[in-house]
Amino acid sequence: MAPTGDAAIDAIDKFIADKKIDTSKQGWRTSVPKPELAKFDPKKSYHWKVETNVGTLKIKLLPDVAPMHVTAWIYLTNLGYFDTLKFHRVIQNFMAQGGCPLGSGTGGPAYKLPGEFKDGVSHDKAGKLSAANAGPGTDGSQFFITFKETAYLDGKHAIFGEVVEGLDTTVKELEKRGSRDGSGRTSEPLFIKKATIEVK
């Protein structure tokens, strides 16, 4: 990959190149190794742009809050990890969950991360990007985007981004196709077509 001029992104891309990760191999997503923590420029903004089949989201990543999660997110995104993955669990008035390579909620990469938490950073409104997990120390590639305030998740799920574009459009489109009964089943397939990173 050509240098981007951003030290954090270039370090992540170098790690990808050095590890010779073969994304053409079947099942590659579950064998992806843990990246090395990147050092982010505090003067820059890092965004996760997610093109779904019901619209596009732009999410500001929060390296000052969760640097390892943001490192991992840029790493997975630059690998093409999220492309074609579905939102396997969407519950109205709660959240949309995706990022499972198996599409079932049971998969992830070959590493797990501990939660990263910061005082004053809360699931206090719709549009928070947070790590889904199966308990402490099990964060991987699965994530959720909140549809409302869910402060009871604070300290259990690491917040590492916030929707800045698409909250009143794409997020609403995801929600209305979710379940009302808590099952998480969607009324039609919902998936990520393409995810990219933007730095400004």
Language-model-detected regions and their locations in the chain:
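Cyclophilin-like peptidyl-prolyl cis-trans isomerases
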Residues: 1-200
